[in-house]
Regions:
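Glycine-rich beta-alpha loop elements in corrinoid/cobalamin-binding modules
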Residues: 1-63
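N-terminal pre-triad scaffold of radical SAM enzymes
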Residues: 89-115, 141, 183
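Iron-sulfur (Fe-S) cluster-binding segments and ferredoxin-like electron-carrier domains
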Residues: 116-132
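Gly-rich Lys/Arg/Thr-decorated short loops/hinges at beta-loop-alpha junctions or inter-strand turns
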Residues: 92-93, 113-121, 212-218
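Conserved structural-core and active-site-/substrate-pathway-adjacent residues in large, well-folded domains
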Residues: 1, 42, 83, 108-109, ...
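Structured alpha-helical segments in the cores of large, soluble enzyme domains
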Residues: 12, 101-109, 133-141, 230-240
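Conserved SAM/AdoMet-binding glycine-rich loop
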Residues: 139-253
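N-terminal [4Fe-4S]-dependent radical SAM core
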Residues: 45, 51-102
Length: 253
């Protein structure tokens, strides 16, 4: 088996290029695995011996051959600005849940919510420029014909150029009735100005994520959201014409 640790856009291409060369040379499968084990982010289980503690937790992982990295490291995309992004998607014939253009604004998160694995393992935070996002979204809208653009990241409202980006998207696509959606917003930095802007096209749903029903539990999971934040955000939403909002909660904390 081949396991990729971390973000895959760069390392996957490196593996495929190595595979093409291996196919030309027609060496053994073991030779191929040995060759790609030196690629940062690649972990080959067969090239390591794993020792467990008595309680079945991992005690140590050591290479069983020479010239194998002693410890595989996860791969991080340092330059998200120029990393390949899907620009020609397969559009299904049937209605699907995420039938929209999905625009990744940045990677990582600085919030540190204790329940969020992604917020911990995808650090550091790396933003894409507005110009790069304009280029991506223009190609995606033309190639798919979708009538909605979803601004997606671990915490979309933390994107430093969100106001500038939404200004562009509304100005550029409102005439074609292409709407903008902001999924899973934080209550403590919800901007009614941006919400008002995107509803000029159509009033998409609003989703907030308080995660827990009491302040004590929100503090325990380090959510950083107060009861007042929830009341203020929902009050503003209703005053602006929304008649419902979606709230995400975790059950069983």
């Amino acid at each position: 088996d081949i396991v990729v640790l971390g973000e895959g856009e760069e390392v996957n291409l490196e593996i495929l290029n190595a595979y093409k060369e291996w196919k030309k040379n027609k060496t053994t499968r073991e030779d191929f695995l040995y060759q790609i084990s030196s690629i940062e982010g690649v972990y080959i289980p067969s090239l390591y011996d794993v020792t467990d503690n008595e309680e079945k937790t991992v005690k140590e992982v050591v290479p069983n051959r020479e010239n194998i990295p002693s410890k595989p490291h996860k791969r991080i995309i340092k330059d998200v600005e120029n990393v390949p992004y899907p620009e020609k998607l397969i559009v299904p014939f049937i209605d699907t849940v995420h039938n929209r253009v999905v625009l990744e604004l940045f990677r990582g998160c600085t919030r540190g919510c204790r329940f969020c694995q992604a917020g911990m393992i995808y650090r550091p935070i790396r933003e894409k420029s507005v110009e790069r996002l304009k280029e991506i979204v223009d190609k995606l809208v033309k190639s798919t014909g979708y009538d909605e653009i979803s601004l997606s990241s671990l915490s979309t409202s933390d994107y430093s150029k969100l106001s500038e980006l939404t200004d562009y998207l509304v100005d550029e696509y409102a005439s074609n009735n292409i709407g903008i959606s902001l999924p899973s917003l934080r209550l403590d930095n919800f901007s009614m100005e941006i919400a008002e802007k995107i509803q000029q096209v159509r009033k998409s749903g609003l989703t907030f994520a308080p995660e827990a029903g009491t302040q004590r539990l929100r503090d325990v999971i380090n959510k950083g959201v107060s009861e007042e934040d929830l009341q203020n955000a929902t009050k503003k939403a209703f005053e602006m014409g929304w008649n419902s909002v979606k709230l995400y909660f975790m059950i069983g904390l």
